[in-house]
């Protein structure tokens, strides 16, 4: 077939083939965007903006395949503003509510919600979800949700979506599924245009066809079209070869004519009138014969002289022609390079570029058609998964020329950014990282914390024996935490590990703590090296450690902590106002405000609105007698006139927004306009203002308070009160001393020493009954500590208190070593029995001999003390033995339970005890005629959660009443 005819036939066939394709192209081909975070093909978020705001766009599909554990929640897909984090579009699964929620920004700047109810999406099974949004650029849009290939719900007449997208594509941020343990996202794609049937087939779903026939026949036509295109390609190949042959023939004829010497046009003489005779033309002039010395051949071509002239050999490799004229061969036409690799035609020869990314192989270079046909470039796929392309312990999927990183392997948790770490869970023994001697605790954010059990110490993953129960092991452990170091006082609890002379022996058990050669009992500076023992003021402290060297001050009190004792400091509180002029000498108050004009500043006035210059406070409740009404309707220890919730129990008096209404009775604790509980709440950050309620991971906790719920700059993991910004760590450094028998001189008052930043208290004297009470008040609380009597010379009472409201109202847990009758029989004979006792103190007389004898006595005393529980073993404490106590108090229901451990063994348990005498209060320690008591490793924690055994106790109580 001549070349022109072949070309015309080819183009005619192409036109005929494309005609049906053009007719069916009205059914647009789906455009698919892979949104998986791990996809190597994942698009830039800014690429979505021009697509979604295209005015011709009428169909958008979101397809996903995932598995969520029971009651899990997750944002599957969302578009947000990268500048202010506002939502443009978001699709969220709410597992606990069996709902899915679609949120998108309308034209008026408000968020529109579409709620799909009764969807079982978080049940630990794999689900396929298809979300179809139609007619988005009009005001009558619709949304259809398909679950596991079946339509589950649809909503009509919706406002426009995507119309609120910013005009700046760079300000759009794309967020997808945030994986949690046991959850995974297998597929996430955004599809624009196309038919529902086409998109559903991407999930291997074959829905009932309700599309027009033209749309449903697209698949058959595609197969027909592919066949026709294959035939067309074959025909075009034949035409190409034919054209190449025609070019060669034409070139040969051109060269032959150019070199032909005998060729020339015939000519005729003019005939005579009688004849017509052809006459040969005159002979042309003789041309000179050419030889090889004139270099007639193409460079590099061998030339041979012959009788008739010269003869040229064949063209060099890489060229084609007659030897005289040679043209470069395009070897790239024979496809020597790997598909997708650029072929560079050289003169002569060719070169293949390097293999594509994800492949490996040589860079091929050669000359000639034969070489190009027989030396094809070979590129082999690189298995990136063997080269650590994905993070360790994650799923890696090798693909041709690339790879894809999937979720963490089973048993691991994390992502490709944070890495995959061993999955931890307290519920699964195989995933529990804790020591067999530790308790596994799951925190609010799903983290796992390990805490060594009673009688053991360490970091929780490794635990060793701890005889004195001060949280330091008897021997050093193979871990790096502070609590892995060897206890420097193995048999004496010292949770601060103080060691003044750094000799490796703790001060608590070092007979010469400062290493000056003078035993502690004779040393006037026990913790300061002073061989000379100089003591200028003749008090009990030598000059080397005396904060007032020339003024006698045995209490060594130093209010402002400046190193100068109050006795010799002319500005005790360090507020810049001299004591003689300061209306609060021991409380900083530069403003010197004094509302009632009694010369006592408001900052330290026990009645700031009632004149009471003597500051008398008989019942030690921090409210002066002049304004103390003792009218307390809710029994939480705060009289009605000062209680910020007079009829609601709230001993802590927490008022987060400082509006004068306590959180317990405030509907909006943070005053951000979102109610704590009722719609449009509940507030996902109840204590931190966040009117927009941003919650990126949809876990029910707002972004602003995710890891620090009360925003007190102490993360929840170590915060003892995560929902109270006023309490962060256990600290008894500030305390109130309460003497319970202030009359008489038979004994002396207790001497309290606070160590380890307020987490350890020591009482050194054989004293009258007394309390050291912290200033922090609690509603529900867990209180624990280590109790140790470090002497063998006495056998009296030691313990702790809770629910302290005043010196006549508190709970006390007290332990007597032996049975003993109190030596003062007035006002009545009091007998103490050995063992642990839980008492409710509600004294009508207050501190004095009646309360003193009532505390000593084991049993109830009228108008003074009630015995709530006594350890039936009647076993006293042992000398120099450590015990650990755990108290749970929930004043809102009257729940009390206390347990004691000796080593790791539970030795006493009060069980559930119900009493509502005191509805919350402060914590502290108690002593009565017992010296050298140590309360070590003290810990308290806010906790209003009602323990499970309370419900069991109530059920049993009702059953007994019924019987």
UniProtKB/Swiss-Prot annotation:
**S-S pairs:** 292-303, 297-312, 315-326, 332-343, 337-352, 355-379, 385-396, 390-405, 408-420, 426-440, 434-450, 452-463, 479-484, 489-509, 525-545, 548-568, 584-604, 607-627, 645-665, 685-705, 721-942
Recorded hits in SMART domains, A to Z, give: EGF (SM00181), EGF_CA (SM00179), TSPN (SM00210)
Q: Which residues are glycosylated?
A: 614, 650, 943
Span of domain Laminin G-like: 29-194
Which portions of the chain have biased composition (kind: Acidic residues)? 662-673
Q: Which residues form the signal peptide?
A: 1-26
Q: Which domain of life is it from?
A: Eukaryota
The family database entries (Pfam families) matched by this protein are listed as: COMP, EGF, TSP_3, TSP_C
List, in alphabetical order, the Gene Ontology terms for molecular function in this entry. calcium ion binding; growth factor activity; heparin binding; integrin binding
Subunit info here reads: Homopentamer; disulfide-linked. Interacts with PTBP3. Interacts (via EGF-like 3; calcium-binding domain) with ATF6 and facilitates its processing, activation and nuclear translocation. Interacts with NOTCH1.
**What is the role of this chain?**
Adhesive glycoprotein that mediates cell-to-cell and cell-to-matrix interactions and is involved in various processes including cellular proliferation, migration, adhesion and attachment, inflammatory response to CNS injury, regulation of vascular inflammation and adaptive responses of the heart to pressure overload and in myocardial function and remodeling. Binds to structural extracellular matrix (ECM) proteins and modulates the ECM in response to tissue damage, contributing to cardioprotective and adaptive ECM remodeling.
Name of the protein in its database record? Thrombospondin-4
- Origin species, per record, is Mus musculus (Mouse)
Q: What is the lineage of its organism?
A: Eukaryota, Metazoa, Chordata, Craniata, Vertebrata
């Amino acid at each position: 077939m001549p070349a022109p005819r072949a070309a015309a036939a080819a183009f005619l066939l192409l036109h005929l083939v494309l005609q049906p394709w053009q007719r069916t192209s009205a059914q647009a081909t789906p455009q698919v965007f892979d949104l998986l975070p791990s996809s190597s093909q994942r698009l830039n978020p800014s690429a979505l903006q021009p697509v979604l705001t295209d005015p011709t766009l009428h169909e958008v599909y979101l397809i996903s395949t995932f598995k969520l554990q029971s009651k899990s929640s997750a944002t599957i897909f969302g578009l947000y503003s990268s500048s202010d984090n506002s939502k443009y579009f978001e699709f969220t699964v709410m597992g606990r509510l069996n709902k899915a929620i679609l949120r998108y920004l309308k034209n008026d700047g408000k968020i529109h919600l579409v709620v799909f109810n009764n969807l079982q999406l978080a049940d630990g099974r794999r689900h396929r979800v298809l979300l179809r949004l139609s007619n988005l650029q009009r005001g009558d849009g619709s949304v259809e949700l398909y679950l596991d290939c079946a339509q589950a719900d649809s909503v009509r007449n919706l406002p426009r979506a995507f119309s609120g997208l910013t005009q700046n594509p760079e300000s759009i941020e794309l967020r997808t599924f945030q994986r949690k343990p046991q959850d995974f996202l297998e597929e996430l794609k955004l599809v624009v245009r196309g038919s529902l049937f086409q998109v559903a087939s991407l999930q291997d779903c074959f829905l009932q066809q309700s599309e027009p026939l033209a749309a449903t026949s697209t698949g058959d036509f595609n197969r027909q079209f592919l066949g026709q295109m294959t035939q067309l390609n074959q025909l075009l190949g034949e035409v190409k070869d034919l054209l190449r042959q025609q070019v060669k023939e034409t070139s040969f004829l051109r060269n032959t004519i150019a070199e032909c010497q005998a060729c020339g046009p015939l000519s005729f003489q003019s005939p005579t009138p009688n004849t017509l005779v052809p006459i040969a033309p005159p002979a042309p002039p003789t041309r000179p014969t050419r030889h090889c010395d004139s270099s007639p051949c193409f460079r590099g071509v061998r030339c041979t002289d012959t009788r008739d002239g010269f003869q040229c050999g064949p063209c060099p490799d890489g060229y084609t022609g007659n030897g005289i004229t040679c043209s470069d061969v395009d070897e790239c036409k024979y496809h020597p390079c790997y598909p997708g690799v650029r072929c560079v035609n050289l003169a002569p020869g060719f070169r293949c570029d390097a293999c594509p990314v994800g492949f490996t192989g040589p860079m091929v270079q050669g000359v000639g058609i034969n070489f190009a046909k027989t030396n094809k470039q070979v590129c082999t796929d690189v298995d990136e998964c063997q080269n650590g392309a994905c993070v360790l312990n994650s799923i890696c999927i090798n693909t041709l020329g690339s790879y894809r990183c999937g979720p963490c392997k089973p048993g691991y948790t994390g992502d490709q950014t944070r890495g995959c770490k061993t999955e931890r869970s307290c519920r699964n023994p195989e995933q529990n990282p804790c020591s067999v001697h530790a308790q596994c605790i799951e925190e609010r954010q799903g983290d796992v914390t390990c805490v060594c059990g009673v009688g053991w110490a360490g970091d929780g993953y490794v635990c060793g024996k701890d005889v004195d129960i001060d949280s330091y092991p008897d021997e050093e452990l193979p871990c790096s935490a502070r609590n892995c170091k060897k206890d420097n006082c193995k048999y004496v609890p010292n949770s601060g590990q103080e060691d003044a002379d750094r000799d490796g022996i703790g001060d608590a058990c070092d007979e010469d703590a400062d290493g000056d050669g003078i035993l502690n009992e004779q040393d006037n500076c026990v913790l300061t090296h002073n061989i000379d023992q100089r003591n200028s003021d003749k008090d009990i402290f030598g000059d080397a450690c005396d904060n007032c060297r020339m003024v006698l001050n045995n209490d060594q009190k130093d209010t402002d902590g400046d190193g100068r004792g109050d006795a010799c400091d002319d500005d005790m509180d360090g507020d810049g106002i001299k004591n003689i002029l300061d209306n609060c000498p021991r409380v900083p108050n530069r403003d010197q405000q004094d509302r009632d004009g009694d010369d006592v500043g408001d900052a330290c006035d026990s009645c700031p609105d009632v004149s009471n210059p003597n500051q008398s406070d008989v019942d030690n409740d921090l409210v002066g007698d002049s304004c103390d009404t003792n009218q307390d309707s809710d029994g939480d220890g705060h009289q009605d006139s000062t209680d910020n919730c007079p009829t609601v129990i709230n001993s802590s008096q927490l008022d987060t927004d400082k509006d004068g209404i306590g959180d317990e009775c405030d509907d909006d604790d943070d005053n951000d306009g979102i109610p704590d509980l009722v719609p449009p709440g509940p507030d996902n950050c109840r204590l931190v203002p966040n009117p927009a309620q941003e919650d990126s991971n949809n876990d029910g906790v707002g972004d602003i308070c995710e890891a620090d719920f009360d925003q007190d700059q102490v993360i929840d993991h170590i915060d003892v009160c995560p929902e109270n910004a006023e309490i962060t760590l256990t600290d008894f450094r500030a305390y109130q001393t309460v003497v319970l028998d202030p009359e008489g001189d038979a004994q002396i008052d207790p001497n309290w020493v606070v160590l380890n930043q307020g987490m350890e208290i020591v009482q050194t004297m054989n004293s009258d009954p007394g309390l050291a009470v912290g200033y922090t008040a609690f509603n529900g609380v867990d209180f624990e500590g280590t109790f140790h009597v470090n002497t063998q010379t006495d056998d009296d009472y030691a313990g702790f208190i809770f629910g302290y409201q005043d010196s006549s109202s508190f709970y006390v847990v007290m332990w007597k070593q032996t049975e003993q009758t109190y030596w003062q029989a007035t006002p009545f004979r009091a007998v103490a029995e050995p063992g642990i006792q839980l008492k409710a103190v509600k004294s009508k007389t207050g501190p004095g001999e009646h309360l003193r004898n009532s505390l000593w006595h084991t049993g109830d005393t009228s108008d003074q003390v009630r015995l709530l529980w006594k350890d039936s073993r009647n076993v006293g404490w042992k000398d120099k033995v450590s015990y650990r106590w755990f108290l749970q108090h929930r004043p809102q229901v009257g729940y009390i339970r206390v347990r004691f451990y000796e080593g790791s063994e539970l030795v006493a348990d009060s069980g559930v005890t119900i009493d509502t005498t005191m509805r919350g209060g402060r914590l502290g320690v108690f002593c009565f005629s017992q010296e050298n008591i140590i309360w070590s490793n003290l810990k308290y924690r806010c906790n209003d959660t009602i323990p499970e055994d309370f419900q069991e106790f109530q059920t049993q109580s009702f059953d007994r009443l019924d019987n």
